[in-house]
């Protein structure tokens, strides 16, 4: 089952998202970006869903960390502050999606599903690229150079 990390300082939102998503995904929660960093270092996640405004490090800093260390992991940003321009800026910084609070649970579910599908496609593409590359010197020696 795909793994989702839910990061929000508001326990009610964390619990609501957990209830919504835990039927189809293995969900873990963190109430700060710092705790999310620790979870990301310990386990692999298919999607990170994070609030942007939290005490300590922000969801924006978490986004930067994930983009740098786990570039194939989609990050969905949730915020009570923002507009279309703000959302586009976050997407340019590498967010997979931006959801404005208060959000519809249906919209959250669809966004997470799309992110999981995106992650799955990326993993398949990476495996295909790895299969095309020579795995060792013997395999590399089997490649032929053709002069035209």
What would you call each of these model-derived segments?
Residues 11-28:
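Two-component/phosphorelay signaling modules centered on CheY-like receiver
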Residues 32-35, 58-61:
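Acidic catalytic/metal-coordinating carboxylates
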Residues 44-49:
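Active-site beta3 strand of CheY-like receiver
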Residues 54:
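Receiver (REC) domain active-site loop signature in two-component systems and cognate sites
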Residues 85, 103-112:
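C-terminal output helix
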Residues 117-148:
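CheY-like receiver
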């Amino acid at each position: 089952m795909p793994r989702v990390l839910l990061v929000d300082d508001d326990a009610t939102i964390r619990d609501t998202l957990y209830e919504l998503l835990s039927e189809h995904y293995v969900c873990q929660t963190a109430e700060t970006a710092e705790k999310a960093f620790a979870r990301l270092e310990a386990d692999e996640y298919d999607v990170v869903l994070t609030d942007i405004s939290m005490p300590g490090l922000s969801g924006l800093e978490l986004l930067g960390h994930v983009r740098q260390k786990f570039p194939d992991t989609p990050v969905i940003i949730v915020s009570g502050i923002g507009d279309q321009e703000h959302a586009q800026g976050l997407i340019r910084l590498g967010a997979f999606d931006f959801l404005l609070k208060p959000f519809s649970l249906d919209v959250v579910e669809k966004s997470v599903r799309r992110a999981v599908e995106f992650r799955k496609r990326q993993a398949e593409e990476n495996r295909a690229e790895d299969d095309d590359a020579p795995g060792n010197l013997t395999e590399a020696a089997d490649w032929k150079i053709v002069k035209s």
